Amino acid sequence: AFDIIHLPPLRERQDYILPLAEHYAVRMCRELGYSYFAGFTRHAKAMLQDYSWPGNIRELKNVVERSVFRHGLEDEPVDEVIL
C-alpha cells in the first residue's frame, strides 16, 4: 500500500514563492556562468507574488529561468517576469 501525501498548491503557500524563485534564479545564473544573482526588483517580486501559479513549482521554475535568461544582465536585478 502507498501513503497519500497532500501538498497544497503553490498559490496557497505564498511564503514559498520568493525563496523558491531566488533558488531557481541562482541556479540559472550559475548555468549561464554569472558570478552572482543580482536579485529581483520590487516590481518583479510583486509579479511573482500576485500570480496564481496554476502550474505550481514546475511553472515557477520555468518562468524564473526564462526571465533570468532573457534579462541577460548579471549586474542588474531582474525587473520583468515573463509569465
Please place each PLM-identified region on the residue numbering.
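Nucleotide-binding/hydrolysis machinery
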Residues: 1-83
